[in-house]
């Protein structure tokens, strides 16, 4: 007997319904010509990157399933999906995480789900339309799939997003960022002489992605991060039990792969064009064995481009965490923004209405502590538009005292994908671009009267 899933769950929890919603809003482009998943698909997608529409490739050469890209490359698009102004997204995300922290809603394990509609008789990753994006990438990559694993000692679930290179019909290689809970789980399993089982969930909603991207500072190791997805959905996230392993799968995913990593098994991985705009180097990394593949009857493969899509997924979670912590620790903080020029999580601009001298530097230190991948923090006054690079540069050139306003922190932990942080250690810098406190008229911005052009007789104007 088949279960009817047509009325469940909320739109935000189901990728198929998300795509339908985007199309209804006029925010979906359909590419109906056949496209080669090796380089061509990414090259076409890049022409739309950062725009207000996502892209669905209906015909992928050599494959039976479509590919979707662009869910996260525009905050305007994300805002439309969440019914939020794009500038309010960090506050919306922060509020959802705070709701989870104060009243956690555990995921619900159900008996069945769309992801179990088909279980492949044979494990063959070549049947999935996994693209090769950049010209020098080492092969096809899963780059938008969510890993669910369990602590071998406590059984607590963890969600994360890692990159996986396909190297065979049933083999992958995983890159695990340093400091991630998944790496801790792998070490614990190896110490016990056991494989680490996990599931790889493809085509999930933003709530699950945001749960997976939540910084460790927001979701400590003893908590089940998947509850964050429940907070975004407004209802418990539905999971289904694994069929060959002990780890659950997202019930409404498009695909779910049951996998394991055995102690000591490694394989060369890379290169891969990362969010920094550089290729991650080839290194030996953990080998993954795929034990079983489940999918919907008509699945859609979700991929993302390493760029704006990472800025607006991982970066948005970073913004939300920094904003929530700064508002508690530093009086006067009004807003934060992770700039796209800073790869979405290396440069944070903080807006503050200073109440006391020295609080801008306090904000710099607190921001670095709230999100360790950051390399640079710039603090500006409340009269500066933090999302306007020209305005931030204006504050830097006219308000920064280069002798007293630059804070340099050497040998600090950072992000391994940033080439200036080899082995995760490097130098961080903070810029106090605020007016001297107490304020004087010398640093007041010149203003003109706010006027409307409505009703005026104007000829030849172009706006």
Swiss-Prot record:
GO terms for molecular function: carboxy-lyase activity. Signal peptide: none annotated. InterPro entries: UbiD (IPR002830), UbiD-like_C (IPR049381), UbiD-like_N (IPR049383), UbiD_Rift_dom (IPR048304). One of its GO terms (cellular component) is cytoplasm. Belongs to the UbiD family. NCBIfam families: UbiD family decarboxylase. This is Uncharacterized protein in cooM 5'region. It comes from Rhodospirillum rubrum.
